[in-house]
Amino acid sequence: MTKRSEAKYKIDRRMGQNIWGRPKSPVNRREYGPGQHGQRRKGKLSDFGVQLRAKQKLKGYYANISERQFHGIYVEASRLKGDTGENLIGLLERRLDAVVYRAKFVSTIFAARQFINHGHIKVNGRKVNISSYQLKVGDVVEVKEASKQLAHVLEASQLPERDTPDYLDVDHGKMTAKYIRIPGLSDVPFPVQMEPHLVVEFYSR
């Protein structure tokens, strides 16, 4: 198991949930957290603890975004019209790494970030190597021609545990994904329950 995989599964263990729905997640085999004290019975969380956990889970899901970056996304969401929690999800799903993952061009969101950073992705015909790049409705994401035959790309497109959401128009033959609309919470195929309203409560304290 690579260091990247270990870090990813450590998030699963800390949350006590298989947050990406992966068959190899260690929480499929046990119900306690990482470390020598992981098997201790957990007490009831305070309201703050519940809110913090919701934030950590959402941050972790999107490749463990840094606190500074995640808080910046929250601030932007709070300035938009409408529900801040829904806006937060919409902004997270506009990230290029999230779309590359949703389109099944790679098998994990961690791999999506690395794939973008290594220059394998174009947006509207131009190379973009910033994983946090914010897409707009109508943007077309594509895998570079020279990268389409990479083994992990071909494998990811066949993964059975993930369906592509309907806010993307994906062509796996051409390895393209058109961003059709900004989704809300109910549109996003999270394998576990995400609670952005608790994240809003955390930052509103």
Curated annotation (Swiss-Prot):
This is Small ribosomal subunit protein uS4. Transmembrane segments: none annotated. InterPro entries: Ribosomal_uS4, Ribosomal_uS4_bac-type, Ribosomal_uS4_CS, Ribosomal_uS4_N, S4_RNA-bd, S4_RNA-bd_sf. GO terms for biological process: ribosomal small subunit biogenesis; translation. HAMAP family: Ribosomal_uS4_B (MF_01306_B). The gene is rpsD. GO terms for molecular function: rRNA binding; structural constituent of ribosome. Part of the 30S ribosomal subunit. Contacts protein S5. The interaction surface between S4 and S5 is involved in control of translational fidelity. PROSITE patterns: RIBOSOMAL_S4, S4. It comes from Bradyrhizobium diazoefficiens (strain JCM 10833 / BCRC 13528 / IAM 13628 / NBRC 14792 / USDA 110). Residues 18-46 are annotated as: Disordered. Residues 94-154 form the S4 RNA-binding domain. GO terms for cellular component: small ribosomal subunit. Belongs to the universal ribosomal protein uS4 family.
